[in-house]
Amino acid sequence: MGIETNRSTLVYSLIEGISFGLFDNYQALSKTGIKLNNLFVIGGGSKNEDWIKLLASILDRDLAITEASDAMAAYGAARLAYLGYNNLKHEDVLRPPSVKKVIEKDNSMSPILQDRFAQWKNYYVK
């Protein structure tokens, strides 16, 4: 950051940093052997398609915006509680949500963002 840093650059760096944090978590989850077939975007962040495009490009995967994305976190918590309380198989309760729109990754941005992620990780993840 310097005197030339403007509001747009600052906001972009904030969003990029949050996205890198999500990518770092995604990598950790992937290393556990859990197969991540589909990735869904829910909540307030799902309203900004530019951010989702950036995140998809960092993850190098397309991302799906769900129907009723504002309610999906509460809906997911309720389904997990129902699953635990009723001792059911997860296949009976945890079905994929309805997809409103798929945001495709930008293949031209992925290599650039991977380099920037490596720099971010070098500074922030110890």
Predicted regions and their residues:
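Glycine/Thr-rich phosphate-binding loops that ligate phosphate moieties of nucleotide
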Residues: M1-K126
